[in-house]
Amino acid sequence: MTLALNQLQTLQAHGMHTSAVPLADGDSVVIQQIVRVVPSRRIVCRALWRGQAVFAKIFLGTRANEYAERDKRGVMHLLAAHIPTPTLLLDAELKEVNGRILLLASVDDSDNAESLYQTSDAAKRLQLSLSLVEVLAMHHRAGILQTDLYFKNFLVKDDKVYTIDGDGIRNYAALSDAQMVNNLGVLISKLDVLEEEAWLKTLLEKYRTLNPQVVVDFNQVKALSKNHRTSAASSYADKKVFRICTDIEVQTDAQRFFAFARLFSTLALPQCAADYDALITQSVLLKSGNTCTVAHAQISDTEMVIKRYNVKSLGHFFGRMWRQTRAAASWSNAHRLQQLGISTPKPIALFEQRIFGLRGKAYFLSEYIEAPDVAAYFAHERGSLERAATIKQLVQLFYRLYLLRLSHGDTKASNIKIQQGMPMLIDLDSMKQHNIPFYAAKAHARDLRRFMQNWKDDTSLYNAFVKSFKVVYADHAPLKQADILSD
C-alpha cells in the first residue's frame, strides 16, 4: 500500500521525509495509512514492521516521552488485568526527529465499535451495547477507569471486545461507586438518545449482574448521561471546530477566519471573500435575498451548497461585528448534530471576512444533497408502508430533538429533506442548545407547531402525524403544549 501524497506531506511537515520512518536502533517502520493526527503532538497510523501489520503511535514534541509513557502505562495496566487489548510490540525512539513510537499488534478483521454501532441494525446495536457494558464492568472490577470513553476506543472481532488507546487508562487501588457510576453514565451517553430511552433498564441490569456491589440508580445514570452527552457535543461544536484539531484545519489573520474539514482538505477552496463571491456568481442560485444568498456550486467532483450571509448596511456591520456570525452558528450546529447522530449535510468550511479582526461577510459551505424536501416528498404518491415509515422517522427526529433539548428555530418543510426515507435537517443558523428545561420545552413546542402548519391543508397527513406523535412520545406534555393533543 502506497501512502497517499497528502499523508506523506503530513509526515514531512513533522520532520519525517519518507513513509519508511527510521528508528534510532537502525530499524524502520513503513507507514501505510495515517488514521489520526494531533498536530505537532501525535500521529496514529497503520503500518508494517518486519513484515507484520501493526498499529503505530508516533509521539512528537517536547512532551513526547511523557505522552508515550502514559500510553504505554495504560496498555500495561490493561494487560496486567487480563483485559483484552492489542499487545505492545515495540517502544523505540525516532532517528530523524525528536520523538517516540509505540507499535501495537494489529487486530486483523476487527471493527471499530463506533462504526459497527452506526452500521448495524437495532438488535446488533443492543448486543454491542451490552458487550461494552460488560467490558466496562470488567474495567471497574480491576480498578481501571477509561477517561477517554468513546466507542471508537474499542475494537470488536468475533464478538470479542478489545480496549484500545492506553492514553486514557487510569489505574486505582479501588474505585468509588461515584467514579464507576459516572463512568457508566459517560458510556451510556454515547448511545443514540432514543435507544438509551429503550435500553437503559436492560443495560443497567447487565452492569448490576457483573458488578453487584455498586449501587446503580436509574435516574442518576440517566441524568449523568444527559449531562455528559450535552457537554461533549457542546465542547466539540462550540469550541473544538473553531481551532486546529484532528478533524479541522484553521487559518486566520486580520482579514479572514477560515476553518475547513480535513475530510475535504484536497478541495481547492477559495481563500478570500472575492473568490467566494465569484464562485457564487458562476453557480446555480438557490436563493437570493438581502439577508443571505445561497448557491449550488461544484469544486472538482464535489457538489456543495454555499450560503453567504450578507452585511445589509453599515449599521448592521457595527451591530454584528463582535457577535458570532450566522455562518459560524451553522458550522457549529452541523457538527453538533453529527456528534449527536442526527442527519445533516456534511459541513465543509466556514469563511469569515475580517476587517482588522472584526467580522464582515460570512460563508458556510456544506455538501449538496440531491433529495426532496418533506413537502415535495409527500406530494408524490407513496405506498402506505413507505409513507408510514417516513412519518415515524420524522416524528422520531423531533423526539430526539426534544430529549436533547435542541430547537431548530424554523421547521418549515423546505428545511427538512428526505433522503432514502430518512429525514435530514438543513438551515441550522437558528438552532439552539437549551440548558433550562422551561425554555427548551417552549422552543420545542414552537418547532412542533411550525412543523404541523406544513400539513394544515392535508387532513390525512396531519392526522397520520398526530397518531405517530402519540405513539413515539412517551411524555405527551410537549404535544399538548404544541396543541397537537388536547388535555
Residue ranges and their predicted role:
Residues I144-F151, L406-A413:
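Catalytic-loop of the protein kinase fold
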Residues F151, G168, E370, A413, ...:
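Short, glycine/acidic-enriched loop or turn micro-motifs at the edges of active sites
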Residues N153-I164, N415-I426:
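Conserved protein kinase catalytic/activation segment
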Residues N112-D121, V374-G383:
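AlphaC helix of the protein kinase catalytic domain
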Residues Y162-T230, P423-D487:
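C-lobe/activation-segment region of protein kinase-like
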Residues A20-D111, S131-A142, T266-D373, Y399-L404:
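Conserved ATP-binding subdomain of kinase catalytic cores across diverse folds
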Residues M1-Q32, Q220-Q282:
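Juxta-kinase regulatory segment immediately upstream of eukaryotic protein kinase catalytic domains
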